[in-house]
Amino acid sequence: MSFSYSVKKELCSLITDRDKKYACLYGMLLFCKQFSRESIAFQTENDMAAELFSNLTDDVLGCKNAVAVTKSEKKNKAAVYLLTVDSQKDRDELIYRYHISNNNFHRIHKDVIDNNNIYTFLAGAFISCGSITEPIKEYHLEFVVSFSELAEDLLLLIQSLGISAKLTERKGASVIYLKESESIE
C-alpha cells in the first residue's frame, strides 16, 4: 500500500457531516476524470475513495445507487474502479446543486464552499487527482489537473490559505505542487 493510498484512506474516514460531504464531493467532481453535462466519471485505485464517491453522491442527491461501479484490473493486478453517474436526471441535479452553468464546469466557485470547509474541498480534490510522497523520502504533494483554468483556480485557492504552492506543466496537464513540510502538513 502506497503512502498516497494511506493518506487518501485517512481523508475518506474524516468526511462525516453534511457540509463536509457537500464540499468534498464538489472537490471530487471538479477534479475527476470526466465532469460535464454528458458524463460524470470518477476513476481510482483506492477502494475507500470509490466507496466515498458513491456514498457522497447518493447523500447529496438523496437517493440510493446513483453511481454505477465497474471494477477492472491493471496489468500489475491492481484494482481500478470506474464510477459513473449514468442518469441524466442525476447529473443535472448535481450540476444544479453546485451552481454550475454550461461554461463553468472547470472553474472553482468559492461561493459554493463554506469557508469552514475549504480544506474538505481540497481533500476531495486531492482524493481525485492528488498524490503525496512519504515524508521520510522527501516532502512532495501534487495535484495533476487536466484543465489549465481549473489548475489556476486551485493554485489561487491554496495560496489564499497562506500555503506556498507552484504550478508547472507536465505531459499536457497542469501540475500544482508543494514541497515544503510546513505547507504539506
Pin down the residues of each PLM region.
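DNA-contacting interfaces and partner/effector-binding or oligomerization modules
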Residues: 44, 51, 56-77, 82-185
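N-terminal, positively charged regions that mediate nucleic acid binding
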Residues: 1-39, 43-53, 57-58
